[in-house]
Design a protein with these regions (language model features):
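Bilobed "Venus flytrap"/periplasmic-binding protein-like clamshell domains
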Residues: 21-47, 51-52, 103-163, 167-169, ...
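Short beta-strand-centered segments that line the small-molecule binding cleft or hinge
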Residues: 73-75, 93-101
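Bacterial N-terminal signal peptides that target proteins for export
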Residues: 1-6
Length: 303
């Protein structure tokens, strides 16, 4: 039976009205968060018709945290140490929707560069990231802990980093994670990675309890044939605790069911799983109640 036009229009309208639009704060163009946010939103939107995730460029983690706390965005991507610090504050209103990926911090130099270690960069101009980025915080933690004074270059947007290295205005660019756009661009042009030594990793971890040993797998970037050891921490998709339990449940379910789709869109998103969320959360109560409900139903945590 064919429905009258007005009936079809009514059902279409009610379906649209029922769909919840969620704003996801990412970071400045050219960095890893906007790329991840695009893949994440596409996967969720394709999987869950009741939700529509829309990305918004921000200054990065340092802006996403206060925006989330104030309820001005629904979801926010927050990196490593900043996420750990925000979640550890007494009475924090922030909750975890999902773990994103672990981000090993690295420097990249030109292939013909004489620099072979972090200490070699002493006194040299080094791009550490953008003003609001969690990657920048990690870079500062590494050079400051190791007592390596560098000429710290802060960018307006992450995409400005590679040209500074290629032109010789910077000796190195700091970044983190698998599939980071600036690393990909520079590695294709013969860039070479520099990470902390075993002794340096030990020193960094002793001074920065929010960090952990993290490995950059072999072949994560062009020309990177061996795995590299470094330090880093998990990044998360966070929300406010006042975020709808129904919507967080739907998000968790969509993330779980679209796991292979998300991994196919972005290599580092292979780590975006509900199982990793359980493992990476500092405490179970920091996971949003709606997500916990789905985790119980999926058998990922005990009831």
């Amino acid at each position: 039976m064919r429905l009258p036009f007005f009936a079809v229009s009514f059902f279409s309208m009610t379906s649209t009205l029922a769909q919840q639009t969620l704003v996801l704060g990412t970071a400045t163009p050219g960095g890893g968060f906007p790329v991840y946010g695009a893949a994440f939103s596409e996967a969720i939107n394709a999987q869950q018709p009741k939700l529509r995730v829309e990305t918004r460029n921000t200054k990065g983690s340092t802006e996403n945290v206060p925006l989330l706390e104030a309820g001005r965005i629904d979801l926010g991507l927050v990196a490593g140490e900043l996420a750990s610090a925000a979640l550890s504050k007494p009475g924090t209103p922030l909750r975890i929707v999902t773990a994103m990926y672990a981000s090993p911090g690295m420097f990249i130099v030109k292939g013909d560069s004489p620099y072979r270690s972090i200490s070699d960069l002493e006194g040299r101009p080094v791009v550490l990231g953008t003003q609001g980025s969690g990657i920048t915080v990690l870079g500062h933690a590494i050079v400051d802990t190791l007592g390596v004074p560098v000429g710290k270059i802060t960018l307006e947007k992450a995409a400005d980093g590679p040209p500074l290295l290629e032109s010789g205005k910077a000796a190195a660019v700091f970044g983190a994670g698998v599939g980071w756009p600036a690393f990909t661009a520079l590695a294709k042009n013969g860039g070479r990675f520099i990470g902390p030594s075993a002794a340096e990793i030990k020193a960094i971890l002793a001074r920065n309890p929010g960090l952990q040993p993290v490995t950059l797998p072999a072949n994560s970037y062009p020309g990177q044939g061996a795995a590299l050891q470094s330090v880093g921490s998990w990044s998360y998709v966070l929300c406010n605790k006042s975020f709808s339990e129904e919507n967080s449940y739907l998000l968790a379910k969509a993330i779980h069911l679209s796991q292979s789709t998300l991994a196919g869109k972005l290599e580092q998103a292979r780590e975006t799983t509900m199982a990793n969320t359980v493992a990476a959360a500092p405490r179970p109560d920091l996971i949003h109640p709606g997500v916990l409900k789905y985790l119980r139903e999926a058998g990922l945590i005990s009831r």
